[in-house]
Amino acid sequence: MSVDFQAETPSACARATAGRVLNMPARMSGGGGGTGPAGIAWQRGMAKQTSKIQSFEVMVLGAGIVGVATALHLRRLGLDVALIDRTHPGAGASFGNAGVVQRNGFVPHGVPGSARELLGILFRQSSAVSYDLATLIRLLPWLRRHHAAGGLRAADLYSRVVAPLRAVAVQEHLDLARSANADRFYRQGGWLHLYRSGSCYDRDEAERYYARVFGAAYEELLADEIGILEPGLKIANSRAASLKAIHWTESCSVSNPGAVVDAIWRTFVREGGEYFRADARQLQHKRGGWRLEGERGTVFAGKAVIALGAWSQDILKGLGESYPLAVMRGYHMHYRPLSGASLSRPVVDMEHGFVLTPTDNGIRLTTGLELAERDAPPNPNVIALARKRAEDLIPLGRPLQEAPWLGARPCLPDSLPVVGASPTIPDLWMNFGHAQDGFTLGPITGRLLAEQIAGKSPLLDPSGLSPLRFVA
């Protein structure tokens, strides 16, 4: 394949900390200076930075899939748009996720919050949830709030807000990908939720119930059926008597999430959008709009969109607005499977929280949640424990990276993102807090926000995602 960004070299991954790639190699930064389509796109996207002040209708801060999709939808609605990040588009959590576009996901994300759950992780670190003790203590109020949002009434509300998004998420992804010539990275075939015990399977009954309510198709598989669907899994060594799986048939996945975001960004540039490198912490609210100093000049826009993921709160606090945003970290590592073993779709171990995804660069192992400070050093034990559990299922060979990738997921206590206008600051818009759903929901929430900014009727009712729900 010819996309420069997909060449995930060990040195690049070793330098990736907290979801940002440091000192990115020239090829991975878009081939600047090249004469092919990638180099031309980069030059065009950066060319207008030479003027001292440039004015736009909207500046989008954050170039992960959420920000890139928002910017492209705004551009296609006829607005003059600047996309801004401090590094290459798609270099954060959008780069390192499991690459699944979920049709399922009707219950709030499984972050521990009850006293029983907290005691469980306190005395037993796992690949599903690991923690730094000081961070765990600091997050206790947030975790209790999250636990309350997982009650029956709150969970029912969550399902009804998220169900319309799930219903269109796959198609929105595919439409955007086709227009960006990135559909070659997508594969059908769904993904597997693997359960090693009956009790683990029973705990997920609410997910299956809401799937039936909202028409999301799935298949229940026993051990022998799992082995037929994924012969590369070591079913015989995985307590086959109790092994079950749910095959979410309408989900899809990608072989290279970073390349998908890169392709969408390049399409934004080809269609007349502008890209700037700048530090969003320098954002200033001036009369009539927003001002930000970039590497090669000043960017001014009438409206600003905060799509900075786990860094969104840093900017908003300086502007006098605050949201209960917590950060959950996650890791990935690529391996070359032994003995010719392979997977044809992502597989998630529901008991241990890791995902095995076939990618262009081998099998990607992504971990569960780590409760630690966003910018704290990586904890190598997290990926080591996940690998130990994963090798029960597939024989993993040597790592294809020097060190694990580490990313930060922005989480709100009700497990829903904020998408809409600031309730207190004029001409400020938000699109962040997607937790583990950024890759799935980025294209659709980007469209919904763009339609609101442009004064169009949104495809779906966005009121359930409004920032107003956090106004006291």
Regions found by a protein language model. Give the residues of each.
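Dinucleotide-binding Rossmann-like beta1-alpha1 core, especially the glycine-rich loop
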Residues: 98-224
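Beta1/beta-strand and adjacent pyrophosphate-binding region of the FAD-binding site
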Residues: 53-64
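C-terminal catalytic lobe of FAD-dependent flavoproteins
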Residues: 218, 351, 392-472
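N-terminal Rossmann-fold NAD(P) dinucleotide-binding loop
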Residues: 67-68
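Glycine-rich FAD pyrophosphate-binding loop
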Residues: 76-95
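Short beta-strand to alpha-helix junction loop
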Residues: 157-170, 193-203, 246-266, 377-382, ...
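Helical element adjacent to the flavin cofactor pocket in flavoenzyme catalytic cores
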Residues: 202, 206-214, 241-302
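Active-site substrate-recognition segment that forms the wall
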Residues: 100-101, 105, 109-148, 285, ...
